[in-house]
């Protein structure tokens, strides 16, 4: 594991040096600019591109993580301080952009089993084989988790998001780059990227839940990065709301490149209409 990590960091830093060399070299170019001249990367884009390389490279991520199955456990802490565990299985097929992704999350709690499905820009639920409309809070949470995620940075170019550098900072002795991302829906996320490893250590954002009048400050921290099929993935994620931990997600297994049937993302009502 240590050898793989060192190789990954060596590759990322080597590419970083090459990128910086290209940028510096292009600065002294005084000839006419053609339509084919590549656009120079901004400081924020440089950081994001190296983070993508450190995670496995855009090509590898697009190929390996095109589809897959992730299984794990979610622990939610209620206002009374009690924790409720949910087992989940997430199956997904990536599109060219996040909005074209297909995602199905099957949840199992001690009280019930249900699924949330995102496809064709719509979200619906399934319980006992019948569709239902999820609560506004559940829908908003689903959308928020996709919009303010690690993948949102790794896929910023595909999603046509804009990046801006907020400088460099130090938190608890750790040097980090600070990158602000704004997506096409004007949702904003701030990422804190390790200067040493170029991994995203945590992200922050604000959102106003349905029915609330004031925004909530969210922080999502990433731990336990592991090597999975030539890509790096955090196996533990902790979400806090206004400084209080509310959700902890642990990945148990993840497998990429498996065939996912398209019928899994189809609304049962639409399926019965299509196939009477």
Predicted feature locations:
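N-terminal secretory signal peptides that target proteins for export/translocation
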Residues: 1-12
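Sec-dependent N-terminal signal peptides
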Residues: 16-22
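C-terminal segment of classical bacterial N-terminal signal peptides
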Residues: 23-32
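N-terminal mature ectodomain segment of secretory-pathway/periplasmic proteins
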Residues: 38-40, 46-131, 162-165
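Acidic/charged, solvent-exposed loop-and-adjacent secondary-structure segments enriched in E/D, K/R, S/T
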Residues: 124-151
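Short, conserved active-site entrance elements at the starts or edges of catalytic domains
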Residues: 142-180, 201-203
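Gly/Pro-enriched, hydrophobic low-complexity segments
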Residues: 172-268
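Gram-negative outer-membrane assembly/targeting C-terminal domains
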Residues: 266-276
């Amino acid at each position: 594991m240590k050898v793989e990590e060192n190789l990954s960091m060596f590759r990322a830093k080597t590419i970083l040096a090459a990128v910086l060399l290209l940028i510096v070299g292009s600065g002294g170019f005084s000839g006419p600019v053609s339509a084919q001249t590549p656009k120079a990367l901004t400081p924020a884009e440089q950081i994001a591109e190296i983070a993508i390389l450190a995670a496995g490279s855009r090509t590898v991520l697009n190929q390996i993580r095109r589809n897959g199955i992730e299984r794990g456990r979610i622990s939610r802490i209620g206002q009374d301080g009690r924790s409720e565990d949910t087992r989940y299985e997430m199956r997904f097929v990536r599109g060219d952009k996040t909005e074209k992704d297909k995602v199905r999350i099957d949840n199992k709690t001690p009280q019930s089993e249900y699924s949330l499905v995102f496809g064709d820009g719509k979200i619906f639920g399934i319980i006992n084989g019948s569709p239902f409309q999820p609560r506004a809070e559940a829908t908003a949470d689903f959308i928020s988790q996709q919009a303010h995620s690690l993948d949102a940075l790794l896929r910023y170019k595909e999603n046509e998001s804009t990046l801006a550098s907020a400088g460099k900072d130090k938190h608890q002795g750790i040097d980090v780059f600070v990158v602000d991302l704004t997506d096409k829906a004007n949702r904003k996320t701030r990422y804190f990227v390790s200067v040493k490893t170029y991994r995203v250590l945590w992200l922050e954002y604000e959102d106003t839940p349905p029915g609330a009048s004031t925004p909530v400050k969210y922080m999502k921290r990433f731990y336990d990065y592991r090597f999975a099929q030539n890509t790096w993935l955090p196996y533990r994620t902790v979400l806090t709301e206004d400084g209080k931990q509310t959700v902890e997600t642990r990945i148990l297994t993840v497998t990429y490149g498996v065939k996912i049937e398209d019928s899994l993302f189809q609304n049962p009502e639409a399926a019965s209409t299509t196939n009477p």
